[in-house]
């Protein structure tokens, strides 16, 4: 009996690990926002140009991660430059780049990250069935070879903190060195974004459903 209970506990623990983190929970009803929404008028004069640039390209404007980043204006400036490369100038095709981002959105159950990048991934050509399988917690079916590499590298790096020689050389053959490095770079950067969003308990825009229902 005890062995059966132990095996059941282990199985549940493994299952919990495999489906990733629990959904990022919204603030308690009536609780003040951890980081009140920053306005353009509150941003220092020497960061105004940066803020205007962000408003032009961000689907959430100064909300989401930027609301938190601007608490450290120099960091916001450096991060914006990094995101400019990783979003718009990376060697990875946009389809694969956005796939890598929503993988981290799924792993962190990041409400804003998934809300913002799921439609971008589909627009870039990622099959909806692949994105929906990912969100359901299963290995996506019918992935192309390059999508498989993006998924496997991202998952192994997140969950094992390394990748096997076999996967490394497979990824290098399919993506090439630059795309492989850019893949890991965008993945790590969007872990940072997810952590910032979790720090501030940032959610989907008001009136929009949460991609990951709070538990």
Could you describe each region identified by the protein language model?
Residues 1-10:
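Bacterial N-terminal signal peptides that target proteins for export
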Residues 11-15:
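Short, linear, compositionally biased motifs with a strong N-terminal bias
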Residues 22-215:
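Hydrophobic alpha-helical segments
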